[in-house]
């Protein structure tokens, strides 16, 4: 019940942002911005736990899942170790609903682009 109330509140906040900003695209206030970065982890939780949200909220979640920067952020998080105990939850997880991971491999010659890219 409390999670449902929180989700309905999020839907109201996101709809209000769209009404005020009248964006032309998937993000809350036009171009991807700080508000969208703030809600990216929320979108990941909604998707990861298979929570039910309104169609417009689901479209916003799916925009995050398909965003290349979000996908890189998630991939980096997955390769940097175990979940910390304080963040581990006992909830059932669903298969990741976002796009499939892109095939990747470490470079064979040359210098890596940065410390994160092998």
Question: Where in the sequence are the language-model features?
Answer:
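GST-like fold's C-terminal all-alpha helical module
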Residues: 1-66, 71
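Acidic/histidine-enriched, glycine/proline-rich intrinsically disordered or flexible terminal extensions
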Residues: 77-117
